[in-house]
Amino acid sequence: MSNPHSNNSKNLKHQNFKGQNPKNLAPTKALRIAIFTDVFLGIPGGIPSSIRAQKTSLEALGHQVTIFCPGTQQDFENPLSQFGANHDPNIILVPTAKFLVNGAPFSKWTKQVVRFIEGKYPNLTESFDLFHIHYEATTSMAGLILAKKYHIKTVQTMHGREDMAIAINVPHPFKTIAATGINLIHRTTLKSISKKSPRPDYQNPEPKKLPGLNYQNAEIKNLAPTIARREMWQMMTRQANLADQVITPSAHFAKKLRLFGVTRPISVISNGISDQEIANFTPRIRTYQDHEPLRILWFSRLSKEKRILPFLEALRIAQELEPNFRFIFTIIGDGNQMSKVQKFCKKHFDEASIKILGTIPHQEILQKYTKDQHLSIINSYQFDTQGLTILEAAACNLPVIYADPDMSEIVPNHGGLCAKSPAPRAMAELLLEIYHQPELIQKLSQNLAASEKTYLQSHQIEKLLKLYRQLS
């Protein structure tokens, strides 16, 4: 698939290592990498999945990977967690608060995390060659502070649109208060290592001058129309500019970060999916007959930002527009909208049309529950920077329908279709287009089968190691 932002290739250090074996790239000296993240690794989701896959791939090449993350031993005793800290000595659980944030453990204040890590590793310089940071909250800030103190190079992966997380999830009267408070804590915590003047980077000895942001600029105004969203963009930009190297999973997100003032070198490297997840099965080409119900799979959080309820509304509208339209919608996942999903389905659909399965071990989803499906759905809009669900579906030759045109960059080889707008009616019309043209399913599935499997972690790790070597 062509890259809609390919004209920015000079700015984005997106290099191609096609055809090379990652084992041939492994240095004679194994790297010692510390990963800092605020994401709880014991839950499903794109970020924890990518961190797990990154750790597995690097260790397979002989590198040492230590992860600092929140959680307790009890959290990792969940049988669904195959990445438990109770049996992996290289997963270090930092001081963790007793309360949960969005149902997941959250680390304590940055100072406490810093003290804990320094107590465990008195001389970090002798223990690690570089840091890789995967978020922007307390543990991630601890990584930046320790990196500056011990002169260790840092890679920062910017995963998500935190501005949209606030805009979608925080009730209206509190959006500005929450965003301003988060940005204030972030700015204050990192004040000691922040520089007012731009600094050179390892690729360009001449520092780039930070331009003043013009919030009347149409593109910036569209991305940051409120004070709350401006505050979160400031936080994301600050975090990125304190690293030596920035990674984003997509070119469209890299472009937005540049727009808001990120001056550090940016590389576009997909989060990738684990090779092991698809190693033991051969996906088939999907076909859809016009007498069949359209089988659609959702495997993601049931949350506002993922927009499960607008998709259910699209299904309702599709049935209203075409009474003969039949479907079976399988929902895998859990989240704070589960009860609303159950109520909506009970009110509008018969039991045969909906299967709510809850949380299922990740590998089982790909190898078992995708088998008889026609479509996968990712319905987020201006939130996901990559959408790992798209890549996982692609690995199964399962066509994808989606609402956000930015996701077209991610869908391999035209293996999906985008609705004309994020409105439920537009998605309903797309569903009916497929219903009336069943041959589309086979065509899209064949496109995915013919695509290069560059989304596998084994391919992405080559690019990551290239960056690591430039820094270490």
Language model regions located:
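Acidic donor-binding loop of glycosyltransferase active sites
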Residues: 244, 370-385, 398
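Conserved acidic donor-binding segment of nucleotide-sugar-dependent glycosyltransferases
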Residues: 413-424, 433-438
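N-terminal subdomain of nucleotide-sugar transferases
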Residues: 2-5, 23-82, 87-89, 93
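Carbohydrate-associated surface elements
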Residues: 252, 272
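Nucleotide-activated donor-binding/catalytic signature segment of Leloir-type glycosyltransferases, i.e.
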Residues: 340-360, 372
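Conserved donor-binding/catalytic core segment of Leloir-type glycosyltransferases
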Residues: 288-315, 330
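Membrane-proximal helix-turn-helix segments that form the acceptor-binding/catalytic region
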Residues: 179-245
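Short hydrophobic beta-strand element within catalytic cores of glycosyltransferases
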Residues: 395, 399-402
